[in-house]
């Protein structure tokens, strides 16, 4: 005698003949069908017990004849197709929840290829090429190379979308090295323009990219190995020799001299374009923008000049002794003096400059200042660095650590880098006042210092310029012996001031020269000079 509630072959037929609204809520019928389906997939299983919490069903596997099975399956599919999508999903969930692990694996294998769709190929078929291009435009160079090899359609999308051009443009927008290189090498003319019919094809940019990478790697190697092309400007001062300060751009170099003059040089020809006179003492510091040059002198005055005509626009008389350093930006100027004070000025225009506040607290000459929207930072011969609020001009904290007076510093973001007459360079966290690293190597006073995201470049009274690895210096695990990348020796006197970018260092000295250390345009013959990094090519201005 068969067990109670045995489901015969008529189960599926019964399910199909009963309206769906009646059987969907009937657990026994649904569970019976699930059990039957499971048994049909597992020949070794002869019976299966299913419980819904209130009753149990014993299912015997007994597959119908082939003809009946096909008929019943077609009928099930017919009813399934009549349901809404949500009802279909609900029903399939019921089935899957009652299946065994073996069946789940089989279903997963069946669904896997259905879920793997080539949407990049599918989008253009729907007229959505621009979306496919936009998706692939986020790839880096390595991934873009791989994407080109996927299939011809992907290669077509990359080519017609000019994605190599877009990748280069993205790098130029975000990386100063790429931007500067594009201008110096001339390939910026092919960027940021709508593609003309006769413009370079995608293959041009595809081949340009590795050339750019090779150029960048060569520049980095030149920095590390000290390979450079050296240009020299002889300033030919009338009386006292020495170039105390300088600043440059792509077109000109402006220098302040010990002989009280300001000289403007053409950066390409190295010829002197203009000489500005008016100070009665050495020009110790300067800064310029597209409108004005501001200079500080040992005559205790600050002068403002028209950058184009050289006309004196304003003279500020406030400090009692030499003006040693100054900075201006966004309508604010800060000057410091041998008189131990710091002056904060509101700079509405070249002719409208008013004193806002005088900061006192240093016990010796204030040699250098720097600032941003948050802090004013000053360094003094009293061995301290002081931090002040830019908005309120109130004192914030003192950074202590140098053993002797501080001659130079630069401040950016949270980092302060300072150089001292104790012959060391220190890196500081301005927010907590902690000294992060001490760099040793110079043999005399460190007179000037600048840094960017990669390097620190310092100049000292020993006549040497040193290039340091900034990222390694910020890593406490890095050995001290690995921090100095290169020492450059060409000046025959004290190095007073320097500025640098990704491609060059420009420095000035007590030896009355300005040197341009070019790490980009190094002659091919020097590229193989690994043992003579100081090899130079000198051009003397006339």
UniProtKB/Swiss-Prot annotation:
Keyword Nucleus (UniProt): yes
Q: What does this protein do?
A: Substrate recognition component of a SCF (SKP1-CUL1-F-box protein) E3 ubiquitin-protein ligase complex which mediates the ubiquitination and subsequent proteasomal degradation of target proteins. Probably recognizes and binds to phosphorylated target proteins: the interaction with substrates requires the phosphorylation of the two serine residues in the substrates' destruction motif D-S-G-X(2,3,4)-S. SCF(FBXW11) mediates the ubiquitination of phosphorylated CTNNB1 and participates in Wnt signaling regulation. (Microbial infection) Target of human immunodeficiency virus type 1 (HIV-1) protein VPU to polyubiquitinate and deplete BST2 from cells and antagonize its antiviral action.
The entry's localization annotation reads: Cytoplasm; Nucleus
Q: Species lineage, top-down? A: Eukaryota, Metazoa, Chordata, Craniata, Vertebrata
Domain F-box, first and last residues per copy: 129-167
- GO cellular component labels: axon cytoplasm; centrosome; cytoplasmic microtubule; cytosol; kinetochore; microtubule associated complex; neuron projection; neuronal cell body
Q: Which gene encodes it?
A: FBXW11
Q: What is this protein called?
A: F-box/WD repeat-containing protein 11
Region Homodimerization domain D, residue ranges = 67-116
| Pfam families in UniProt | Beta-TrCP_D, F-box-like, WD40
Q: Which UniProt keywords apply?
A: Biological rhythms, Cell cycle, Cytoplasm, Disease variant, Host-virus interaction, Nucleus, Repeat, Ubl conjugation pathway, WD repeat, Wnt signaling pathway
